[in-house]
Amino acid sequence: MAAKLKKGDKVIVLAGKDKGKTGSISSVDPKSGKAIVDGINIAIRATRQSQTEQGGRIPKAMPIDLSNLAYVDANGKATRVGFKMEGDKKVRFAKTTGDVIDA
């Protein structure tokens, strides 16, 4: 299945403790169906000190399920993503506006 959300997309959180917040996707794991969004779903992780890194409580962005994310269109609204053929190329488009996301 083609990826509806990709790295670098601006998304809004639809459900969970960060509902309504927007951010940019920093990584996507298609196998588990999760994505890491910058500044969203932050958890405090305790890390052990090493020779190069200082230990302590470090905030870390945790993965969010892709079903809880929606692409943000040009109007700043959450939209679903569809696919269409443009010439001989398959492109993503925003269902609310019909604008092509990636040419």
UniProtKB/Swiss-Prot annotation:
Sequence similarity: Belongs to the universal ribosomal protein uL24 family.
Gene Ontology molecular function terms on file: rRNA binding; structural constituent of ribosome
Tree of life domain: Bacteria
Keyword Ribosomal protein: yes
GO cellular component: ribonucleoprotein complex; ribosome
CDD domains in the cross-refs: KOW_RPL26 (cd06089)
One BP term from GO: translation
PANTHER family: MITOCHONDRIAL RIBOSOMAL PROTEIN L24 (PTHR12903)
Keywords: Ribonucleoprotein, Ribosomal protein, RNA-binding, rRNA-binding
Protein function: One of two assembly initiator proteins, it binds directly to the 5'-end of the 23S rRNA, where it nucleates assembly of the 50S subunit.
HAMAP family: Ribosomal_uL24_B
Protein name: Large ribosomal subunit protein uL24
Listed SUPFAM superfamilies: Translation proteins SH3-like domain (SSF50104)
Short name of one Pfam family: ribosomal_L24
Assembly description: Part of the 50S ribosomal subunit.
Ribonucleoprotein listed as a keyword: yes
